[in-house]
Regions:
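C-terminus-biased signal that marks the final domain/tail of proteins
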Residues: 8-27, 142-145, 150-151, 160-162, ...
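Short, surface-exposed beta-strand-loop junctions and turns on beta-sheet-rich folds
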Residues: 34-36, 96-98, 171-174, 181, ...
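Short hydrophobic/aromatic-rich beta-strand segments that constitute the beta-sheet cores
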Residues: 90-92, 175, 299-302
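Proteins synthesized as precursors that undergo proteolytic processing into mature forms
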Residues: 107-143, 255-263
Length: 339
């Protein structure tokens, strides 16, 4: 395994953005931003796939099916983001410098960081059930293997009823309600939420002159109600921009309208090659964007090179099997000629 691969899994400072969206159905997805792709796949974990959780003698081979984007190693899905067949979604995003995990303890259920997503999604049908699971677990610093150190992450967990953020830090294991349904990277979630106070005057409507009512000022362009909305690629700015975009978003409630709108929401923080230099002649880009219809079990995605929306429907597969079902990520741009 290349050293840079190990760097990524250890928590290299890549940037990501996750969001939820609700119309008639519930949608959940994220961007994954990094300087190169190294072999992601869409992975369906069927109901009878045997999970051998690292700190348990029990094999979990009867559970909810899961679909998501993963790096697969030794037939194990290392999920970045996923939903289960019941409509619960979860994603891990980089949290470098703040994430800290515990040693195993005797009075709680010990769960390795790399198995956190499948541990929750395989057993919990709802956010309420997940809360109960979280209250009795201990997130450990156990590595997947020598080549896969613990990634420094925090997590967004959501269903149609609400959204949580989970952060394991040196000062403890924190679970936060997330009223905006958005997560990026640093700083910790309470600080991300607090910074929204700075932008409460922003609006999608044209501004009124409160600067000096006696002074004749003109709105010389559309969109001036959102002057001051951050536009850079830092994690704090992306949090604010996607929160504003999502909270003011309007769309129809059909599947096509909802999916299209979700990609537009996360598209507001797309990273273009050349705008975020991480080393000489190396640039972070949005490798992929996902959108899951958590109700229907459909995983939609596009990539930096292929902006066509592609989809895998978990319910078109036999979910009562034991082996992972794998689909390659379609990276080549697909253009529909009309003549």
């Amino acid at each position: 395994m290349k050293a840079i691969d190990k760097y990524f899994f250890a928590g290299g400072k890549n940037m990501c953005t996750a969001a939820t969206y609700k119309t008639k159905d519930f949608y959940f997805g994220r961007t994954l931003d990094y300087e190169f792709s190294y072999g992601n796949e869409i992975a369906i974990t069927p109901r009878n796939y045997p999970f051998h959780f690292r700190h348990s003698d029990r094999v979990l081979d009867k559970h909810y099916a899961i679909i998501g984007m993963a790096h697969i190693s030794d037939s194990y899905p290392l999920y970045y983001d996923a939903i289960n067949e019941k409509g619960l979604g979860m994603a891990g995003l980089n949290f470098v410098g703040n994430a800290a995990y515990a040693n195993p303890v005797s009075d709680k259920e010990n769960i390795a960081q790399f198995e956190f997503i499948p541990w929750i999604l395989s057993q919990c049908a709802t956010l309420k059930e997940a809360r109960r699971k979280l209250s009795c677990m201990n997130l450990t610093n156990t590595q997947f293997s020598e080549n896969f150190p613990c990634a420094q992450l925090h997590w967004i967990l959501a269903d149609t009823s609400g959204c949580l953020v989970i952060e394991s830090m040196k000062d403890g294991f924190h679970i936060y309600d997330n009223p905006v349904g958005v997560l990026t990277n640093n700083p910790p979630f309470p600080q991300q939420m607090f910074q929204l106070n700075n932008y409460q005057s922003l609006s999608p409507r044209q501004p009124k002159n409160t600067f000096a009512p006696g002074l004749e000022l003109q709105s010389y362009s559309r969109g001036m109600g959102a002057l001051g909305l951050p536009g850079d690629l830092s994690s704090a700015s992306r949090f604010t921009k996607v929160a504003f975009t999502k909270m003011n978003s309007r769309s129809g409630d059909s599947e096509l309208e909802s999916v299209s709108q979700f990609f537009h929401i996360l598209g507001s923080v797309d990273q273009q090659r050349g705008c975020c230099e991480v080393a000489e002649n190396k640039y972070e880009i949005t490798l992929y964007t996902s959108c899951c219809n958590a109700i229907k079990g459909i995983y939609y995605y596009n990539t930096y090179e292929n902006h066509q929306i592609n989809a895998v429907d978990m319910h078109r597969e036999n979910l009562d099997t034991t082996a992972l079902i794998r689909y390659p990520v379609l990276e080549t741009q697909n253009i529909l000629f009309q003549n």
